[in-house]
């Protein structure tokens, strides 16, 4: 059974004062089952982030409908968790309090302090539980944003270029932590990324977009076992295939 469906979805942004229209997405049709890890790749301006915001319910389509378990998505809900390109932390709360507050919105029971400590330790922030956002680097703050959403275990985890601000080693570590969470709670992950290798490493399916207006150019299923070897011949073949479709 499909977990998420986009049926003939288009999105047009209008600038009323300038009488101008921007066609961000046009005629998007997509069906995704639960427990898939889907990455969306494509050039800038092809509507990748717009698609995530439509799925989250933050904005509504100009045409078509988006269904979660056969129910129309028309607003945000705790069933969907989203991590944006830039950290979105409450500056008046400590790192631990930020994580606890977000988790408590999803769960009626208070989040276990030990679980918070474990998650922070996994991403190298165990010593920063009592620090405030202004005391963190951009990459550290983004790791907190990821943990804050992860700990609530949403049915759909939406990631908008979440690892772009991290250094290479931290980025690879976070890729594995996100994969571990996905395999543990068996939810649906949808991630926007500009990194083709990252998409092949993490995904069961890759959606390749083309711009102006944003359309789906091709969908590629990645049939590789986890954990994946970035140096294997099959991995390299998938990476090269995606790059070729993107005209690189």
Residue ranges with predicted function:
Residues 64-76:
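Conserved ABC transporter NBD signature motif
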Residues 132-136, 140:
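Conserved ABC ATPase signature
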């Amino acid at each position: 059974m499909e977990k998420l469906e986009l049926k003939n979805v288009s999105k047009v942004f209008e600038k009323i004062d300038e009488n101008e229209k921007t066609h961000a997405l046009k005629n998007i049709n997509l069906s995704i089952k639960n427990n898939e890890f889907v990455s969306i790749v494509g050039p800038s301006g092809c509507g990748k982030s717009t698609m995530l915001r439509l799925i989250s319910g933050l904005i509504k389509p100009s045409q078509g409908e988006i269904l979660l378990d056969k129910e129309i998505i028309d607003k945000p809900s705790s069933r969907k968790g989203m991590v944006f390109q830039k950290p979105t932390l409450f500056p008046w709360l400590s790192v631990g309090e930020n994580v606890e507050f977000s988790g408590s919105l999803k769960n009626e029971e208070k989040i276990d302090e030990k679980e918070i400590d474990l998650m922070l330790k996994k991403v190298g922030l165990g010593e920063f539980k009592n620090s405030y956002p202004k005391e963190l680097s951009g990459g550290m703050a983004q790791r907190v944003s990821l943990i804050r959403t992860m700990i609530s275990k949403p049915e759909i985890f939406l990631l908008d270029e979440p690892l772009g601000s991290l250094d290479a080693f931290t980025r690879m570590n976070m890729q594995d932590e996100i994969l571990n969470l996905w395999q543990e709670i068996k939810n649906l992950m949808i991630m926007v990324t500009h990194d083709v290798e990252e998409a092949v490493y993490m995904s069961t399916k890759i959606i390749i977009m083309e711009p102006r207006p944003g359309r789906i150019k091709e969908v590629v299923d990645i049939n590789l076992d986890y954990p994946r070897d970035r140096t294997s011949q099959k991995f390299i073949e998938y990476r090269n295939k995606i790059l070729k479709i993107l005209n690189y």
